[in-house]
């Protein structure tokens, strides 16, 4: 595994080292690995005005795999603490916090998300206490079969949930409609992540799923340009609230117009995910 950041500008190296120190203070990890675009030297900082007049911004995340022995605190709580202490960075921080046994189980199965991190990542901190298992290398045929199976399961769910959402919308049952629409969106993110990486995060939070899938498709990420548009951020927040707030909180409200826009947008998302996933599967095997 690589240990040098010399392929990055000094300013980026200093930021990464500062983040590593914050992670160490919060988590007490066994290993910290930088992975993704900054590890590979392929990071992007992309800003432009679209034909719709909306400003779009795509900035690569700082991606870290944080390896622990045991976690007494929930992963999302640790992530929230770290994110609150790194808000001053322009680059978003993406954290994968996992126990070593979970990671090694994935490596032994042939899960290419963790295998790619071990192969391409940059080791930023290591206590020397734990080791990664030798990753099982899937054959191209196995990789394609697994990706197709994941796609068949999760994309089909998105299709069924979208039917349910539209039916509820026609009945003016807007809370049920947005709940089903959340399930559509979640299923589409899961399908994308599993087809491309073989990995599905343990979260229903759409903001986090969007961040996890960010490096897989800029077009998918910018389907909701929440970073540069308050209107888009509010729409996506309403969609995110469909999972719990729409079902259990009396003060949750969504208008017919807002829901109609979301249904149309997620319908576009479904078409996009179908295209990028089937293209990916065709390249395998």
Predicted regions located by residue number:
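Metal-dependent nucleotidyltransferase catalytic core
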Residues: 2-26, 45-108
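Terminal alpha-helical segments
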Residues: 25, 31, 72-80, 94-285
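Short gly/ser-rich loop at a beta-strand->alpha-helix junction or flexible surface loop bordering the NTP-binding
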Residues: 30-51
């Amino acid at each position: 595994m690589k240990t040098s950041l010399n392929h990055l500008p000094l300013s980026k190296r200093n930021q990464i080292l500062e983040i590593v120190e914050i992670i160490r203070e919060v988590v007490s990890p066994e290993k910290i690995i930088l992975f993704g675009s900054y590890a590979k030297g392929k990071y992007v900082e992309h800003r432009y005005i679209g034909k719709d007049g909306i400003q779009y911004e795509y900035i690569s995340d700082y991606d870290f795999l944080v390896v622990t022995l045991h976690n007494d605190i929930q992963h999302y709580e640790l992530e929230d603490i770290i994110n609150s202490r790194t808000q001053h960075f322009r680059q978003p921080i993406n954290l994968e916090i996992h126990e070593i046994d979970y990671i090694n189980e994935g490596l032994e199965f042939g899960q290419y998300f963790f295998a790619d991190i071990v192969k391409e990542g940059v080791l930023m901190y290591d206590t020397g206490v734990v080791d990664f298992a030798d990753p099982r290398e899937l054959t191209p045929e196995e990789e394609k079969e697994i990706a197709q199976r994941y796609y068949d399961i999760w994309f089909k769910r998105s299709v069924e949930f979208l039917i349910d959402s539209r039916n509820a919308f026609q009945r003016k049952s807007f809370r049920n409609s947005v709940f089903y629409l959340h399930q559509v969106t979640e299923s589409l993110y899961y399908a994308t992540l599993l087809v491309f990486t073989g990995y599905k995060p343990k979260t229903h939070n759409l903001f986090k799923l969007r961040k996890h899938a960010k490096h897989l498709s800029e077009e998918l990420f910018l389907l909701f340009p929440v970073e540069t548009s308050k209107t888009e951020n509010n729409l996506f927040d309403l969609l995110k609230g469909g999972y719990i707030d729409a079902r259990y909180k009396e003060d949750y409200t969504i208008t017919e117009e807002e829901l109609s826009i979301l249904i149309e947008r997620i319908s576009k998302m479904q078409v996009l995910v179908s295209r990028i996933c089937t293209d990916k599967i065709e390249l395998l095997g």
